[in-house]
Amino acid sequence: MATTADFRNGMCLEIEGQYYFIVEFLHVKPGKGPAFVRTKLKNVTTGRILDKTWNSGVKVEEVRIERRPYQYLYQDEMGYNFMHPETFEQITIPGASIDGVQFLKDGDMVEVMVHATSETVLTCELPPHVKLRVTYTEPGLKGDTATNTLKPATVETGAEVRVPLFIQEGELIEVDTRDGSYIGRVKE
């Protein structure tokens, strides 16, 4: 059991039989009345966000999770399929519970979160940055580098990323999987 004072981002809670990750939390101490905690929780199975307010000091059920490395294999109608590199065990995770799934490509290593006691697969976490090749983008105008203008570019996974005008087709770029933003060009 944990109290609201123990809340931190990424913590997993069990509420009414459902598993939730804390996305954001804020301790509020109003001038009048008792303190409380506002949280934004993400449902592990559906991916939906829930806003919940807790009275300060309330006890909640914390879920112990283990992080295990898995390799992405392929996608089918059941979801996304991963394989453990040592045991070759294969698992399927629904796409709704994976953040940044549009940046996932064959062979990528991810961290799969597993319930420590029941061995239930909860979700997976992509690395914060991935290197992807640009497959399509409009050509930039020569000499148009004075402004910080961005243009849409399609990467090898099919996702669309906003990139600077100087990026061309075939270039390797680094993308932040948390918000889908362009980080920089990768030297080959």
Curated annotation (Swiss-Prot):
Pfam families xref list: EFP, EFP_N, Elong-fact-P_C
Predominant subcellular localization, coarse grouping: cytoplasm
Record pathway: Protein biosynthesis; polypeptide chain elongation
InterPro entries in the record: Elong-fact-P_C, NA-bd_OB-fold, Rib_uL2_dom2, Transl_elong_fac_P/YeiP, Transl_elong_KOW-like, Transl_elong_P/YeiP_cen, Transl_elong_P/YeiP_CS, Transl_elongation_fac_P
UniProt subcellular location: Cytoplasm
Described function: Involved in peptide bond synthesis. Stimulates efficient translation and peptide-bond synthesis on native or reconstituted 70S ribosomes in vitro. Probably functions indirectly by altering the affinity of the ribosome for aminoacyl-tRNA, thus increasing their reactivity as acceptors for peptidyl transferase.
Family membership noted in the UniProt record: Belongs to the elongation factor P family.
The name this protein goes by in its record: Elongation factor P 2
Species assigned in the record: Porphyromonas gingivalis (strain ATCC BAA-308 / W83)
Taxonomic path: Bacteria, Pseudomonadati, Bacteroidota, Bacteroidia, Bacteroidales
Name of encoding gene: efp2
